[in-house]
């Protein structure tokens, strides 16, 4: 993807302060019966549908051929809405309930601390396990220190932000990663590359029962502001691309501090 430079001021960014689901991509394996396809669910932070070229509203400078290929054989969400904050949005996805209907989910402790009671807020992945699926989660986690490994996920490689507040700002590298419930270890490398590698390994058969259909929730963090691309993209980003700023629906915010008005 070729991206122009973005303003560090998130209120002036096209991405605003949203956590959205870009696509659900359902990939059916020829070896499985039609009613139990493999499921790859890609979930990203702070990303507009205008930055995925398979969507009609995408900006002319966007080019995402790999995602487009997946979307062509899967499903795109074109008329859907999710909450605008990390934890509530994930709570909705994991439970299938509106944010205010998710019992026990709460912010607790230092940001981004959060907790929940799995008995009061069960995740629907457990139903897939009962239906014969093997389940996996790879990437960012921001829904309580309990990541659900062993209960909801058979396989998990996780960056647990609530558990490690001191590491919660490391969206792009040097993340504390736990592999299948093990002690978290500092992990080098660009997070998007790491998550993609681990997801590819899982899809190709590592860490799962090859006789079962699989469900993988893949949560990328690298699209989160302040938008720091991998070093290899140096020189591919055109600083002259003109990006029109969206209309501010809140106006000039009279009476608010200067930093809010910006």
Region roles according to the model:
Residues 5, 28-30:
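Short, low-complexity segments with poor structural confidence in diverse proteins
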Residues 13-15, 39:
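N-terminal export leaders
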Residues 16-28:
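Bacterial N-terminal signal peptides
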Residues 1-13:
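N-terminal secretory signal peptides that target proteins for export/translocation
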Residues 30-262:
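Formylglycine-dependent sulfatase
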